Curated annotation (Swiss-Prot):
GO biological process: bone remodeling; canonical Wnt signaling pathway; cardiac epithelial to mesenchymal transition; cell fate commitment; keratinocyte differentiation; keratinocyte proliferation; negative regulation of apoptotic signaling pathway; neuron differentiation
Keywords assigned by UniProt, alphabetized: Developmental protein, Disulfide bond, Extracellular matrix, Glycoprotein, Lipoprotein, Secreted, Signal, Wnt signaling pathway
GO MF annotation: an example: cytokine activity
Protein name: Protein Wnt-16
PTM (free text): Palmitoleoylation is required for efficient binding to frizzled receptors. Depalmitoleoylation leads to Wnt signaling pathway inhibition.
Location relative to the cell: Secreted, Extracellular space, Extracellular matrix
Intrachain disulfide bonds: C81-C92, C139-C147, C149-C168, C221-C235, C223-C230, C294-C325, C310-C320, C324-C364, C340-C355, C342-C352, C347-C348
Tissue expr: Isoform Wnt-16b is expressed in peripheral lymphoid organs such as spleen, appendix, and lymph nodes, in kidney but not in bone marrow. Isoform Wnt-16a is expressed at significant levels only in the pancreas.
Residues spanning the membrane: none
Function in brief: Ligand for members of the frizzled family of seven transmembrane receptors. Probable developmental protein. May be a signaling molecule which affects the development of discrete regions of tissues. Is likely to signal over only few cell diameters.
Glycosylation (residues): N143, N189, N311
Sites of O-palmitoleoyl serine lipidation: S227
Length: 365
């Protein structure tokens, strides 16, 4: 990247710094841009020129070796969000503006990032979880000096049951600590009742994402003994795959809780007759009901479902009836040509046939 380009990016980030002061809760998601940045670009620009708030930049400067993990955490969250919602009316697509505008100049998820809906809740939770997962993995891989394996589990076990702690347990507590330091913006720094409610909601959902990673920690063991007798086992704690964490958060999304939009000492359920039911730290919370994702809304940046591919025989969310919102669907035939019946010919090449197939593709009207 040449000097002129770097200077232009620096000026753009200075503008973002001013916006962060004016709109703190709305700018919380700028770091997510790192998840779609080209490999090596964030490291080349340096912490000062990235679309981060002042606290994040300071933490980045003190721990620059964590930048690859931050980028990987954002990538994990973005990818899993798209995977979990790929068949839904809202499919967690990155906005076109975010991919074409200069670095961080447009919110990655557009309207949903600051709408206070169930979709906002999932985005914040899965991105926070991605950061925990990525940083913890880096610790276990030995990529950082200040964290490694979970040292609290190096001793102990159960002699009577024939196992002891060993190996390298994932230090998820360090990942959670860093995620809180990097993502959680103090509520006291905001003005306006609406801002405070939305920020409190986002902070809660950040923590819900972190709790999902911790909740799905599992124990792996390796056997030791003559001829595989497993007389003694060495065990360690490890994080689940991020796909499994995504499934848990999707379930939390389906059962998310609407909270009151009025500022109180603590968040309350919106429905008065349910306020005695406690809100748990691993619940996903939202303030506003989701918009109609069936039809295009250019003002909100909602593309609608017209033209989306659907499954004619499915009764689920990907089925044409649900995805197309009752508008019906178009069917067209797609011709596929691929190599098939490949054989190795001595010596030395592979000979294949060209096989054609026709497939019906259904798209929403």
């Amino acid at each position: 990247m040449d000097r002129a380009a770097l200077l232009g990016l620096a000026r753009l980030c200075a503008l973002w710094a001013a916006l962060l002061v004016l709109f703190p809760y709305g700018a919380q998601g700028n770091w997510m841009w790192l998840g779609i940045a080209s490999f090596g670009v964030p490291e080349k620009l340096g912490c000062a020129n990235l679309p981060l708030n002042s606290r994040q930049k300071e933490l980045c400067k003190r721990k620059p070796y964590l930048l690859p993990s931050i980028r990987e955490g954002a990538r994990l969250g973005i990818q899993e969000c798209g995977s979990q919602f790929r068949h839904e009316r809202w499919n967690c697509m990155i906005t076109a503006a975010a991919t074409t505008a200069p670095m961080g100049a447009s919110p990655l998820f557009g309207y949903e990032l600051s709408s206070g809906t169930k979709e906002t809740a999932f985005i914040y939770a899965v991105m926070a979880a991605g950061l925990v997962h990525s940083v913890t993995r880096s610790c276990s891989a030995g990529n950082m000096t200040e964290c490694s394996c979970d040292t609290t589990l190096q001793n102990g076990g159960s002699a009577s049951e024939g196992w002891h702690w060993g190996g390298c347990s994932d230090d998820v507590q360090y990942g959670m600590w860093f995620s809180r330091k990097f993502l959680d913006f103090p509520i006291g720094n905001t003005t306006g009742k609406e801002n405070k409610v939305l920020l409190a909601m986002n902070l809660h959902n950040n923590e819900a994402g972190r709790q999902a990673v911790a909740k799905l920690m599992s124990v792996d063991c390796r056997c030791h003994g003559v001829s595989g007798s497993c007389a003694v086992k060495t065990c360690w704690k490890t994080m689940s795959s991020f796909e499994k964490i995504g499934h848990l958060l999707k379930d939390k999304y389906e059962n998310s809780i609407q909270i009151s939009d009025k500022t109180k000492r603590k968040m309350r359920r919106r429905e008065k007759d349910q306020r005695k039911i406690p809100i748990h730290k691993d619940d996903l919370l939202y303030v506003n009901k989701s918009p109609n994702y069936c039809v295009e809304d250019k003002k909100l940046g909602i593309p609608g479902t017209q033209g989306r591919e659907c499954n004619r025989t499915s009764e689920g969310a990907d089925g044409c009836n649900l995805l197309c919102c009752g508008r019906g669907y178009n069917t067209h035939v797609v011709r596929h040509v691929e190599r098939c019946e490949c054989k190795f010919i001595w010596c030395c090449y592979v000979r294949c046939r060209r096989c054609e197939s026709m497939t019906d593709v259904h798209t929403c009207k």
